[in-house]
Every structure is written in structure tokens, then in C-alpha cells.
Design a protein with these regions (language model features):
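Hydrophobic, aromatic-enriched interface-forming segments
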Residues: 38-44, 48-72, 76
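A structural motif corresponding to the C-terminal end of an alpha-helix
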Residues: 40-53, 83-97, 159
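Oxyanion-hole/transition-state-stabilizing segment in secreted/luminal serine hydrolases
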Residues: 1-30, 59-63
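Substrate-gating cap/lid alpha-helix
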Residues: 62-101
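Second-shell loop/turn segments in exported
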Residues: 23-32, 68-74, 137-144
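Structural recognition of the beta-strand scaffold that forms the well-ordered cores
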Residues: 1-5, 12, 53-58, 95-98, ...
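Extracytoplasmic/secreted proteins, especially bacterial periplasmic and envelope-associated proteins
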Residues: 26-29, 33-40, 44, 75, ...
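Histidine-centered active-site loop/cap adjacent to the catalytic His
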Residues: 121-174
């Protein structure tokens, strides 16, 4: 059993490079390069272990709770996940594990569930500290915290349980 988490740093690199002109189009070239890199990673992994189930985790939008109105970011994450899934599906014993919804929205945070929320009415309402994603580390509101990792683990385990019969071989017992 092999788990792989890739892609998040690639996305952040594009965001930092294009912070003032960020668009969905900014990610097209980097996504293609990422897909090439992911293909190489999976090929190398498969050369070392031809039978193991490989579970590749998707990425999540850490900005969703505080900025649900930035729809382009959600589109970018969805496109990135689709690009990942496209590569993963080329290997019959590799599986894509989506985590965007469970991390971005899975804790029941009000802002995450209400995407039609009106613009903040006061300076206080716009304070990033007023809304928190309970699945992210409080110090950076970016990386998963214990709750976030538990949610991710649950998604991975659901995928393993659903697919293990395709790659898990029972040892001959004598």
C-alpha cells in the first residue's frame, strides 16, 4: 500500500508567481508539467513495486472558508484534481482520493456551507480570524490540523476498503 500526496506546492508556486493576475488560465501550463511529473513518480513507484495499491490524494482549497466568493480558486482546484485523476486512472491499481470537499467544507463551517453569503457588512466581519476552517492548522489556516488529517485518513480508508480486493493478495497459509 502506497499513499502519495502531491500537487499542493505546485499550485502555491503558481499563486505566488501570479498573485496579482491570477486566473484559471494561469494554471494550464503548470498543470501539464505537474501531470508529467506525476506520471514519472507513478512509473518510478511502479518499477519498485508492481503490485501495490497506490492512492494519490487530491488537493484542497484552503481559502474556501474565508473566501467562498472566489469561485476561480475552486475551479482551479477542481481542474487540478481532474488532471491528477486523469494520470492516476492510467494505472489499474492506482486510485485517486478526492479530499477537497471534506477539507474545504467537511467540518460544517458556516461560510463553507453558505456560498451565497452576502459580502461582509463591516470591517469586523471581514477579519480572517472571525471564520476558521476547523480542519486547518490555526497558525497558518493552510495545512491540515489533527481534525483535517483525521478527515483525510477517513477518505483514504474508504477508498482502500472499496478497492483493496483488486490488489491485496492473501499469502498462502499452511
Amino acid at each position: 500500500l502506497i499513499t502519495v500526496t502531491v500537487g499542493g506546492n505546485d499550485i502555491m508556486k503558481v499563486i505566488k508567481k501570479n498573485i496579482f493576475g491570477l486566473s484559471v488560465d494561469s494554471f494550464e501550463g503548470p498543470l501539464e508539467k505537474y501531470q508529467e511529473n506525476l506520471s514519472e513518480i507513478l512509473e518510478e513507484t511502479r518499477s519498485l513495486n508492481s503490485d501495490a495499491g497506490i492512492y494519490v490524494l487530491g488537493v484542497y482549497n484552503p481559502f474556501y472558508v474565508n473566501f467562498p466568493e472566489i469561485e476561480d480558486m475552486q475551479t482551479i482546484i477542481q481542474n487540478w484534481d481532474e488532471g491528477t485523476k486523469e494520470i492516476v486512472e492510467k494505472d489499474e491499481n492506482a486510485y485517486f482520493v478526492p479530499i477537497n470537499e471534506v477539507i474545504s467544507q467537511g467540518t460544517g463551517d458556516e461560510a463553507a456551507l453558505n456560498t451565497n453569503k452576502e459580502s461582509p457588512s463591516s470591517e469586523e466581519d471581514n477579519d480572517l480570524n472571525t471564520v476558521k476552517n476547523k480542519a486547518l492548522y490555526e497558525e497558518d489556516n493552510f495545512h491540515p490540523n489533527t481534525t483535517g488529517y483525521q478527515l483525510i485518513t477517513r477518505e483514504v480508508m474508504k477508498n482502500i476498503d472499496a478497492t483493496k480486493d483488486t490488489w491485496l493478495k492473501e499469502e498462502n497459509a499452511s
